[in-house]
UniProtKB/Swiss-Prot annotation:
<dbReference type="Pfam" id="PF12849">
    <property type="entry name" value="PBP_like_2"/>
</dbReference>
<dbReference type="InterPro" id="IPR019546">
    <property type="entry name" value="TAT_signal_bac_arc"/>
</dbReference>
<feature type="region of interest" description="Disordered">
    <location>
        <begin position="24"/>
        <end position="52"/>
    </location>
</feature>
<dbReference type="InterPro" id="IPR052738">
    <property type="entry name" value="ABC-Tungstate_binding"/>
</dbReference>
<feature type="compositionally biased region" description="Polar residues">
    <location>
        <begin position="24"/>
        <end position="37"/>
    </location>
</feature>
<feature type="signal peptide" description="Tat-type signal">
    <location>
        <begin position="1"/>
        <end position="32"/>
    </location>
</feature>
<dbReference type="InterPro" id="IPR006311">
    <property type="entry name" value="TAT_signal"/>
</dbReference>
<dbReference type="InterPro" id="IPR024370">
    <property type="entry name" value="PBP_domain"/>
</dbReference>
<comment type="function">
    <text>Part of an ABC transporter complex involved in anions import.</text>
</comment>
<comment type="subunit">
    <text>The complex is composed of two ATP-binding proteins (HVO_1886), two transmembrane proteins (HVO_1887) and a solute-binding protein (HVO_1888).</text>
</comment>
<protein>
    <recommendedName>
        <fullName>Putative ABC transporter anion-binding protein HVO_1888</fullName>
    </recommendedName>
</protein>
<keyword id="KW-0732">Signal</keyword>
Length: 342
């Protein structure tokens, strides 16, 4: 399914985005709202017939327009209305911790594990994956193009004092960026390093305007590339790059034992829809600029039961081995689901 890119570039400076998915077309700019009503999860419409599901999700699923393909189908099947709160993964998880969402769709496994361990989420499911890429100006002032190590590329950018724009918003992308800086042995600071506290679309625009480097999820970059001059300088694992740039997404219903008023049954229905053959096909067929943005990974003859529990739930002793297994699993997904000519 080809798309017209969401015109989120017009919404510079917008924080959390609150919209009713399925009620607006792909070309309409998102409606901005920096506040979430307390106790918004688990509500029902005034006529008592149409249920409302509050989804807190990362900006990449919203900015790419993927939810415009998924949510209307779910709404029709379940006579429901999906209220989408688009924000960084950290903020989306915090929204759910406060009881203001029924379900989350996010992409930071460590933060997801903490959410599960603390009892706020249940029944996590793998949904899809893509990867991160390091992008920068075409003239590549730091000379990182084609590097095989994201950490080495980051260290080279820092050594060169080349401008790097960080989302700085506790999103899944921001968490990944900080992990790479740590691997590089660099504590980013100084005039060359700019934290802007914005979503991925705004960050790409500002990096483009500043002739800067940034870390982006591949999906948002592909959906935006006609509007910017940045180029991929370091590839992610979808194209043979380092596994540290992996980007898996998971869906987690909020635990009704924590918040009895959440719409748990509808949240479970949503998780079931995303991971069903129908939902997975919609994800697989979703493209921008001729490229597939996300690769579904919920259906398998040999399901990975680790998706349901925290990766290092058994404590620090096996944490490092769990991380390596996670890398191996991601490499397996790439081999199974990503075409060789992608």
């Amino acid at each position: 399914m080809a798309i017209e890119r969401r015109r989120f570039l017009q919404a510079a400076g917008v924080g959390a985005v609150l919209g009713l998915s399925g009620c607006t077309g792909n070309t309409s700019p998102p409606q901005a709202n920096n506040e979430t009503a307390e106790g918004s999860g688990g509500s029902e419409s005034g006529d008592g017939s149409t249920q409302e599901l509050t989804l807190a999700t990362t900006t990449s699923t919203y900015d790419t327009g993927l939810l415009d393909a998924l949510n209307p189908v779910f709404e029709e099947k379940f006579n429901a209305r999906v209220k989408t709160i688009s924000q960084g993964t950290g903020a989306a998880i915090e929204t759910a911790r406060n009881g203001d969402a029924d379900v989350i769709l996010v992409h930071a496994r460590g933060a997801e594990d903490e959410f599960l361990q603390d009892g706020y989420g249940v029944n996590r499911r793998d949904v899809m994956f893509n990867d991160f890429v390091v992008v920068g100006p075409a003239d590549d002032p730091a000379g990182i193009s084609g590097m095989e190590s994201a950490a080495d590329a980051f260290a080279t950018v820092a050594d060169a004092g080349a401008t790097f724009v960080s989302r700085g918003d506790d999103s899944g992308t921001n968490k990944k960026e900080l992990l790479i800086w740590e691997a590089a042995g660099v504590e980013p600071s100084g005039t060359w390093y700019r934290e802007i506290g914005k979503g991925m679309g705004d960050t790409l625009v500002q990096a483009d305007q500043s002739g800067a480097y940034t870390l982006s999820d591949r999906g948002t970059f592909l959906a935006t590339q006609d509007n910017i001059d940045l180029e991929i300088q370091v590839q992610g694992p979808l194209k043979g790059g380092p596994t540290i740039l992996k980007n898996p997404y998971g869906v987690i219903p909020v635990n009704p034992a924590k918040y009895p008023d959440v719409n748990y049954s509808l949240a479970m229905a949503y998780a079931g829809f995303l991971t069903s053959p129908e939902g997975q096909e919609i994800i697989s067929n979703y493209t921008a600029n001729g490229s597939q943005l996300f690769f579904p990974n919920a259906l398998s003859e040999n399901p990975q039961f680790g998706q349901y529990v925290p990766v290092n739930y058994d404590g620090g002793e096996n944490a490092s081995s769990s991380a390596s297994v996670s890398d191996a699993q991601f490499e397996s997904w790439v081999a199974q689901h990503v075409p060789e000519d992608f």
